[in-house]
């Protein structure tokens, strides 16, 4: 039986081309992307992933066409990548947008496109649980990257990608320096609404079980 070809999931700036955006968005919007202007807005210290703002030029002029979108992919820094994989942060975020965005009771950007490879190392979960129990986080990050490189027939790291709405008037606080008191009040207000919605909710337990089941 012929092997199924893996989907194309770009991970680097040079791969986010107009043709790729058209492939992802043309069916949704009935228009093609002609050009892309990329801006890195999050990478390096304090970031588990890399975040790009992509300004799109379309072959049509309509109010419903997004003028920019946000792309999120895993970090290229081994320690950050290892931590993200070890805690399943990339997979959880993709699944949350795909399956739970309407049920979270949190303001979330609109999802335009999401993709990730199948898990090539499902056995690794138990190993990572053991490492997190007995090793410091930095050691777990390094060990996770090494396991991922050695696991399976394909040494390439698992790919993840999110394309979401660009909230152009949003101001994300620094993940290193932290935010202001006003930022904390806004964040805690949103968390309070989330907590109130899901507290002692049997439906919410089902949502949690669904996500955990997809991660196993």
Segments the model singles out, each with a brief description of its role:
Residues 1-40:
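Juxta-kinase regulatory segment immediately upstream of eukaryotic protein kinase catalytic domains
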Residues 41-216:
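Conserved ATP-binding subdomain of kinase catalytic cores across diverse folds
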């Amino acid at each position: 039986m012929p092997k199924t070809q893996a989907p194309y999931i770009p991970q680097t700036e040079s791969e986010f081309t107009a043709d790729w955006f058209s492939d992802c968005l043309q069916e949704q919007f009935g228009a093609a992307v002609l050009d892309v202007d990329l801006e890195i807005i999050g990478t390096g210290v304090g970031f588990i992933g890399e975040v790009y703002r992509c300004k799109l030029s379309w072959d049509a002029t309509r109010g419903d066409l997004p003028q920019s979108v946000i792309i999120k992919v895993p970090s290229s820094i081994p320690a950050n990548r290892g931590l993200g994989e070890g805690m399943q942060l990339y997979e959880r975020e993709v699944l949350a947008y795909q399956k739970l965005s309407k049920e979270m009771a949190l303001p979330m950007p609109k999802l335009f496109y999401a993709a990730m490879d199948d898990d090539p190392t499902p056995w690794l979960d138990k190993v990572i649980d053991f490492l997190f129990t007995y090793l410091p986080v930095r050691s777990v990050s390094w060990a996770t990257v090494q396991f991922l490189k050695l696991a399976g027939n394909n040494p390439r790291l698992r790919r993840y990608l999110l394309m979401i709405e660009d909230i152009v008037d949003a101001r994300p606080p620094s993940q290193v320096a932290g935010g202001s008191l006003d930022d904390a009040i806004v964040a805690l207000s949103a968390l309070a609404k989330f907590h109130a919605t899901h507290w002692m909710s049997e439906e919410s337990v089902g949502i949690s079980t669904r996500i955990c089941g997809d991660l196993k």
